[in-house]
Amino acid sequence: MPPTAFALNDFITRFQLQLPPSLRPVHQQRQAAVLVPIICHPTPTLLLTRRSADLRKHAGQVAFPGGAADKTDRSIIETALREAQEEVAIPPENVQVLGVLPPLDSVSGFQVTPVVGLIAAQTRFHPNEDEVAELFEMPLDEAFALTRYYPLDIERKQQRHRVYLSWYQQQFVWGLTAAIIHQLALQISDRP
């Protein structure tokens, strides 16, 4: 699909028609969720954050809004929506949830479920300065260009892991965030 031809309707159709890899059973890991917010501009974008440098974990890294599940959350989708409201002031009622991707294991011991949602273009975002240093948007056609992600195989705790690395403007996108974008790009791609 040529980058200039990328449209929101194409994405929605492909997302809903292409089943993700089978969902893994939930382990005894702590649960977390992130919202993968797709902003419905004429040229759709992903909303990303750069985490505050003052945070204990993942300080200064590019991330989707999200965090750990609370006991009060009725579902993992509710976790993603609550965290997005806390971090960037997206009202849950302004999110049209399209679905979820298979959970990924984070280096901090969480099983993280990405929740894909559409956000109206006129929505105003306000970062929680305690958690978010910066907000930025990446056009979907750039985000889903599989050639922009460079694989790196590393060994952690005597197991091999593949991480993806990418740059967007001055932002370094890697780790779980890059893995989520790459996974979503593969799901909607024309590749068999």
UniProtKB/Swiss-Prot annotation:
PROSITE patterns: NUDIX, NUDIX_COA. Mg(2+) binds at E83, E87. A motif (Nudix box) lies at residues 67-89. GO terms for molecular function: coenzyme A diphosphatase activity; magnesium ion binding; manganese ion binding. It comes from the Bacteria. Its EC number is 3.6.1.-. It holds the Pfam family NUDIX. Keywords: Hydrolase, Magnesium, Manganese, Metal-binding. InterPro entries: CoAse, NUDIX_hydrolase-like_dom_sf, NUDIX_hydrolase_dom, NUDIX_hydrolase_NudL_CS, Nudix_NudL. It is an enzyme of class 3 (hydrolase). Its cofactor is Mn(2+); Mg(2+). Transmembrane segments: none annotated. SUPFAM superfamilies: Nudix. Residues 29-160 form the Nudix hydrolase domain. The keyword DNA repair does not apply. GO terms for biological process: nucleoside diphosphate metabolic process. Belongs to the Nudix hydrolase family. PCD1 subfamily. HAMAP family: Nudix_NudL. Probably mediates the hydrolysis of some nucleoside diphosphate derivatives. This is Uncharacterized Nudix hydrolase NudL.
